[in-house]
Amino acid sequence: MRKGLASRVSHLKPSPTLTITAKAKELRAKGVDVIGFGAGEPDFDTPDFIKEACIRALREGKTKYAPSAGIPELREAIAEKLLKENKVEYKPSEIVVSAGAKMVLFLIFMAILDEGDEVLLPSPYWVTYPEQIRFFGGVPVEVPLKKEKGFQLSLEDVKEKVTERTKAIVINSPNNPTGAVYEEEELKKIAEFCVERGIFIISDECYEYFVYGDAKFVSPASFSDEVKNITFTVNAFSKSYSMTGWRIGYVACPEEYAKVIASLNSQSVSNVTTFAQYGALEALKNPKSKDFVNEMRNAFERRRDTAVEELSKIPGMDVVKPEGAFYIFPDFSAYAEKLGGDVKLSEFLLEKAKVAVVPGSAFGAPGFLRLSYALSEERLVEGIRRIKKALEEI
């Protein structure tokens, strides 16, 4: 009898962003004043009106199993939101609610990937994508994006990496970790190319509300029915309404795919916590949500400007101004090389400056560091000041 764990988990790595955040929390518990730039979550609390809707649902006894794809009211509200805001028409039967966008992506990759199928990943990329793809026997294929071009994705970039085994491309705009918002015209060209080649588009739109300046967010599925038919539109309540711990995300896609994803959901998650779904429903239906989102977006835009200004004071620092999300992704290569890489640099900054950052190699970009500016302006300035001071000793 063979013993031991399955080979599929032998190379599985824990999330580096969660690991960094855990280390920072551990130090804080010991009384150390650590400034955390690692967290991928807003520092705002979930609005009270959303919490109250959840409490109300609890008191009304909404504590039993729910339909695996999500309560009907929530799926209907998501369909209304997608039509009104994203200009894409979906039926509730084409929507599946699961335990956060991360679980939604897990189910999508489970549904579409066979051994050896390739998935294009514009790089830098969110740390979870390649791990999930490999877990299901897929091959992540990096599409390197240039800092000098603002980490924008072009059709030519995509064409260079497409092969007969290409099954899908992940589009994450606004982007984590770079903050890039992909240009609409280029996205259209890429989408049309994917239609021609029969390549799925997995559109991760979790940061759609956090777009700054002249940048414009667009859902690829809105381009045409042909594009919609090959697209998995993924979103969540985590960032938009500061509900990261609630774990509620969803996918909208053609019904034949939605049925498969719902079946997989039923055999894994069963259903998202029933009473929590009523909080998500309130987030979509309550007019106060718009004011809350605007408040967060305005705060993040101010902090982005502050982060760019403060980081630019560090000698040799090259900073691309983010157009969206709430991350900044500066090139620290000049300093990382002196210490043996960006992982060593992040360890040095945690030890010396008591600042937690995420090494760029986790995102496929060695030499860079990701800093979240989802923290108070005062702590933001103090944290970058500490980084600057520590780097002077290298």
Curated annotation (Swiss-Prot):
GO biological process: amino acid metabolic process; biosynthetic process
Site annotation Important for prephenate aminotransferase activity: residues: 13
Subcellular location as annotated: Cytoplasm
GO cellular component: cytoplasm
Enzyme Commission (EC) number: 2.6.1.1, 2.6.1.78
Single GO MF descriptor: L-aspartate:2-oxoglutarate aminotransferase activity
UniProt keyword terms in alphabetical order: Aminotransferase, Cytoplasm, Pyridoxal phosphate, Transferase
Catalytic activity annotation: L-aspartate + 2-oxoglutarate = oxaloacetate + L-glutamate; L-arogenate + oxaloacetate = prephenate + L-aspartate
Catalytic class of the enzyme: transferase
InterPro entries found in the cross-reference section: Aminotransferase_I/II_large, AspAT/PAT-like, PyrdxlP-dep_Trfase, PyrdxlP-dep_Trfase_major, PyrdxlP-dep_Trfase_small
Residues modified to N6-(pyridoxal phosphate)lysine: 239
Residues annotated to bind L-aspartate: 40, 126, 176, 370
Pfam families, per the entry: Aminotran_1_2 (PF00155)
Annotated function: Catalyzes the reversible conversion of aspartate and 2-oxoglutarate to glutamate and oxaloacetate. Can also transaminate prephenate in the presence of aspartate.
Subunit structure, as described in the record: Homodimer.
Family that this chain belongs to: Belongs to the class-I pyridoxal-phosphate-dependent aminotransferase family.
Official protein name in the record: Probable aspartate/prephenate aminotransferase
Record organism: Aquifex aeolicus (strain VF5)
